[in-house]
Amino acid sequence: MLTGSGPQDRDETIFHHKPFAVIADKLTRSGYGVLRYDDRGVGLSKGNQLNSTSFDFAQDAAAAYHLIKKEYPASSVGFIGHSEGGMIAQIADSLVNGAAFHIYLAGPGISTVDLMIKQNARYLKDIMTEEGVHTYITQLRPIFEVIGGSEELSIKQDAINKQAKRLYNSLDPKDATKVAPSDLAYAMSMSSLVYNKWMTFFFGYEPKRYLTQIMCPILALNGSEDFQVVPANLEAIKRDAIKADVTTIELEGLNHLFQNCKRCTLPEYNMLTETFSEDAMETMVEWLTAKGF
């Protein structure tokens, strides 16, 4: 099981919720063996989290895969990834010469630049004018593209500084103050991202590069109320995983953590008592059974 972005333990602990512990319990009770592990630099795992990218995490996932195959060579071993964990599964598949199956829990299908543009638009619509949101996301895209580009750091930083100030000063002052106190502060915060190895890899990631090569069955799930990885993402997975048997399902009323939500906002994650939808877990088990695993 592959966790989402940020330092995560084996339970993918988020607030008071431990979704991976809940999912693992469900799968184990259904007859499936599960391997969970702390991310590098977290819990009992060694390594440097800060200087690692999703590719590094995919290498860890591949190592976990090979560990299981060594102990249980006849077993079918697949990846279950939540959010960035879906990205990690896509990359890891290329490192292990093909897993038995993939399950993406809000895993990316569209480019991460597109994903983050949609995420920002959804978040900002609650605090900005409609015109402000349109202006912001239109001019934000070039910044994200530069962050994920291959130019030298000094060139990237200069380009982002200029574009960030241009973006900030094009906004209505009331909208501008929602993102930063000044154009300089905004430019500094955005240009600093080029020094983050994880961020530069993330914004340069194109799922299509890996999806087109995956040959195992894929189950891709998204909650209808997910504003971090929008449900429209599912179509891209079905379109680009041309060699795979792909099943995509949009689960009604669920957020990014696969909780039944009411307001379906980020602060609500912590307020909800449900950790992970039983329907979502049943969907996974039924799919695995139907595929003969």
Q: How would you describe each model-predicted region?
A:
Residues 1-26:
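Short, surface-exposed "cap/lid" segments of acyl-processing enzymes
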Residues 19, 50-71:
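Alpha/beta-hydrolase active-site loop
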Residues 19-44:
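Conserved alpha/beta-hydrolase
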Residues 63-125, 129:
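Primarily recognizes the serine-hydrolase "nucleophile elbow" in alpha/beta-hydrolase
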Residues 105-201, 205-209:
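Accessory cap/linker subdomain of secreted extracellular hydrolases
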Residues 214, 220-222:
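Short beta-strand/loop motif that positions the catalytic acidic residue
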Residues 227-233:
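Conserved alpha/beta-hydrolase "acid-adjacent" motif
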Residues 254-257, 263-293:
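Catalytic active-site module of serine/aspartate enzymes centered on a nucleophile-bearing elbow/loop
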